[in-house]
Amino acid sequence: MSLIEIKKVENKKDLKTFIDFHYDLYEGNEYDVPNLFSDEMNTLSKDKNAAFEFCEAEYYLAYKDGKLAGRVAAIINHKANSKWGKKSVRFGWIDFIDDREVSKALLDAVEKYGREKGMEDVVGPLGFTDMDPEGMLVWGFDQLGTMPTIYNYAYYPEHIEALEGFEVDNKYVEFKIMVPDEVPEKYAKIAMMIEKRYNLHVRKLTKKDIFQGGMGQKIFDLINDTYKDLYGYSELSQKQIDQLIKSYLGFLDFNLITCIEEWTDGEHKLIGVGITMPSLAHALRKCRRGRLLPFGWFHVLRAIKMHKTNIVDLLLIGILPEYRAKGANALLFADLIPWYQKYGIEWGETQVELETNAGVQGQWGALTPVMHKRRKCYKKIIK
């Protein structure tokens, strides 16, 4: 029998090894989209990620016969546990060679950590919050990954489902939606009608709106409100919101962000937002081992600012429930579709959606949606 050793990440050098393992394991894979090393370091560093206000975590490396063979993060989100009445330890950032002794040892380490912390079950793959990738790919292994989601080899779910005690906790789907030659008549008519009937209006943003006008704050307050009932969601803290505004919003193309406001008695109430961006999938694949230097930055800049891609990622779409029924999503897409056409975008990637979320999936109907990926989250009771 081979010797499997589990080592806890103790310092920055270990953390670098933890991050770099993914690049090594997926080198040459034509579908994996590696995250930027700097983003991974910021997310996993306990002194940098604002989620550690209410999360705690340990990271583990697995060695087989002295050679690095796997990694996993064990995460406890105390805010989510409190909100949902759970005592769960999450596993995330899980990667391993095709060896069932290795995958078992990694998940045993997560279970042991959870047991020591008084947790009652193991769930995952999940990150610290819903802003992190979640769900193990179980179908669609021949589809290009995206920056906001996990790509994994087909043997991963086989390993998890073969382990004693693990069962499926949730199922997710993702869709490819096509950019039409013209705004669908359905969207155009509804958009015109609700503008007049409900006084809903499109608002485009500037950097000044985001950083000085308070719109960045309003956007994430809205996201908290519209996502609050989703599986495992924990509301973003003020520190997280500040971090997201500073780190990400300012770098996006504001033409691809659409806000919807209700105008009443001089008040402009934000009721919906769509944050989309040119896909960085091909650009990130050109960043050697997730590094922006020496030439990775050029490919990322070309994608974001010069739109050198035909794919758009629909990162965050949030509309208050009472306005979804009024057709506010039609107003959103009636504004975004002409921008996609102008930039040469041919299709878009939705993000991870619960398989049971018919309301979200229904909004893609006029855009020829094709379900092309499936994911699962797993759960095991700690004994």
Regions found by a protein language model. Give the residues of each.
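Acyl-donor binding region in acyl/amide transferases
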Residues: K83-G165, R288-A366
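Short beta-strand segments
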Residues: V123, K176, C259, I275, ...
